[in-house]
Every structure is written in structure tokens, then in C-alpha cells.
């Protein structure tokens, strides 16, 4: 399968476990799948694989943690489940797995801080494992909101995968609601600024191959991604606008 899909075998094992986890917890109430893993598994046809799972939750973190743990502990591939970061409405579960002597860990991030802004949706989860995992769907954050969170992430943190996912969102022709992006920036305490998306470009470039190569079936250059984002979000115009505002103040 690894050769057929173009991904490294260890990452496909991890993706299989990750997909199995989604299948097992799909009926738990009050959890809404989101983030880069959701975007790639639902809307983008797997240009990259993932290593973690993100949810917005509408119940207490401890309640959801208990329900997920109860379901997963019964599965033979799960060796143990521990609690990672637990800070003010955010809780990380760490699932340690062992499948045919291939061991690893998957993060399940539960976030109650980020409130649902648009109505939740239900989407089919695309995957490569039809012979082992049935077709299934699960509750998700709305597509438009999910996309807005991803774009906001390019302005609020410094992870190459955020820029890569946004690049693929643009190529897929998905709607990017900038007003919703502004709301997501505000709710996470970050400034909405197109220029912030490119502020640490050199750091992103330095991390690009190390961070992205293991996740991709087909390599893509940092330059291609950053140029596409600069054109779509009109970086040149944003710089000129900032320059003119500065001149007026002086």
C-alpha cells in the first residue's frame, strides 16, 4: 500500500490507526472534528497525511476524555493512553499504539475554548483502508469555519503545515471567508494581518523539508507555496497599504 499511495510505510500505519480512532469515536456526542487532519481527509483528497486529531468540544474536557478513553482502551492496538497538556479549556490525550510491532503515538486535542461560530456539519471521512475500516461519517466544525481557522493559524503560529494546507485550500477553490478569519484571529488573541502570514518566512523555509517531507506523497517547494499565498492574499498590496498608512502618520 505504501508504494501505491506514495507515502512512507510508518506514516501510513499511523494514518491507519488515526482513521481507526476516528471510526471508533464517531458517535460520541459533543465533539466536532476540525483542523488540518479533517481538511485533508474530507475536502482535499489526502495531499498529506497527519499525526494528530483536533476537536472542538461542547462538553467538559474531562467528560469527553473519559468517553474516548473508554472506547479506545478496548481496542487491541492501543497500549496506553495518557494525558498531556491540560490548560484552560484545552486537553491533549496521547494514544500510544502498537500494530504489528510498529509503535507510535497520536495526539487527540480537545478544545473547548474555541466556540462554534457556524452550524456544525456531517461529512464522510475519506481513507485508504476500505478492506479494514467501513465507510463512515462524523460530526465536524462547518467547512467555512474550518477553513477560516486554518488560515488564521498561518497568522498566529509558525507551522509549515498551516501554510501548506492553506495552499491546497486555495488550489481546491474553497471559499475563504476573511471576515470569519478575522473572528478566529480575535478569538485566539492574534492580530489579523496578511503580512503576519509571511513575517517568519525564513524560519518556515528552514523547517520546510524537515517538517513536510515525511507527510507528503509528492514533494512541493516552499517557494511554490509561499508565492501562491502571496498572490492570493495580495501581499504586495498589503505592504503598500501599510507603507502608505505609516507615511500618513509621519
Which residues does each PLM region occupy?
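Active-site glycine-centered loops adjacent to acidic/histidine catalytic or metal-binding residues
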Residues: 36
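Structured mid-to-C-terminal alpha-helical surface segments
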Residues: 1-31, 41-48, 53, 58-250
